[in-house]
Amino acid sequence: MTASSTASASQPGRLRIAMLGTRGVPARYGGFETAIEEVGRRLADRGHRVLVYSRNPEPGTPLPRTYRGMRVAELPALKKRSLETLSHTALSVRHLLPRVHPDVAIVFNSANSPFLPALRAARIPVATHVDGLEWRRGKWGPTGRRYYRAAEALAVRYSDALIADAQGIADYYAEEFEADTDLIAYGAPRVDVGTDRLAELGLQSGGFHLVVARFEIENHVDVIVDGYVRSGARLPLVVVGSAPYANEYTARIEQLADARVRLLGGVWDQELLDQLYAGALVYYHGHSVGGTNPSLLRAIGAGAAVDAFDVSFNREVLDDAGRYWATAADVAALVDSAEADPDAQVLRGNLSRERAALYDWDQVTDRYEALCRRLAEQGPRRRRPSGRRTGAFPA
């Protein structure tokens, strides 16, 4: 086993838990935010005092002071890709140390690890959710990749626990740093929706292919669009997604698209998005470096047949319920085969729901709660892994 196990039973006693390092709640963007909302509200329901540090996408409208039982601390951030997360986390730590002093802090994203020594100096037990292999993301240049590799080492050195959301991530930290992790995946919502709102987009159930992804190179939206365009598809490809700092990549996707491709941009209406997942003939998932992906979990929770980029993280979630691709030619062949046998896609969607049942938010919360109790009882660790790399995964 590369990941240490955590107990599943709730115990009495209230904890003060701070969650920081993300855009916070309400969840609008990304897996971390979804996890914080789903886990944080359940922890609050169990009597814990949960504080979430949040950024506001609409500065003219203040965030609520409380949300689904959680307290919300709204703080600003620099609007620059390389500094937005770090600047917000710096302010969060500055706010937390003199005012809050929680029993446990959960820091999301290993990029925030330069702030861990300050938390440790204040004797606050801290767990770091390390996310995926950020240094492999195509959007980062050499400096960014070096930073993320250094940040991983700091997270290993200064965290009292590391959280991995996929076995592949746990294996990476075990092999590269000889460090244990707590393996806690995300939950998959059970999505049972109608199809009435598809008409707003001129769509009908089973009558379109779907992509939902942030426009980043490692999510392979361009490969999916390219493969679809090469196919003989009659049904449209609906593309949901955007990115605030990806104009060049967005332009490439637009250039690859033909008249059958419908680029919707971001869709923040969750009911409509769920109907898109549930109504798609096939959902194409191109994420490759981020561990267990919430978009994939939401898709299988809606009963979507899934064709996914062939990496261990996606196979871990889908197993035999998925089909897999690596190139645009692969995508083209899968598109054509899906349209040739739509009944088979319905059966694959049923298999997706069976896989989704393995990812339960209540059980996820059990594991977070057990981890927080363990850290609060043990306090900061005196002996920690060194953070030195074994060289198993060279840059």
Can you annotate each of these PLM segments?
Residues A18, E200-N219, V225-R230, V238:
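Conserved donor-binding/catalytic core segment of Leloir-type glycosyltransferases
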Residues R46, D343-R381:
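A charged, aromatic-enriched C-terminal amphipathic alpha-helix characteristic of glycosyltransferases
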Residues L86-P98, P102-D131, W135, G291:
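An aromatic- and histidine-rich active-site surface loop
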Residues G144-L162:
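Membrane-proximal helix-turn-helix segments that form the acceptor-binding/catalytic region
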Residues T250-E271:
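Nucleotide-activated donor-binding/catalytic signature segment of Leloir-type glycosyltransferases, i.e.
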Residues V282, G301-A308:
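Short hydrophobic beta-strand element within catalytic cores of glycosyltransferases
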Residues H287-S288:
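Aromatic "clamp/platform" in nucleotide-sugar-dependent glycosyltransferases that forms part
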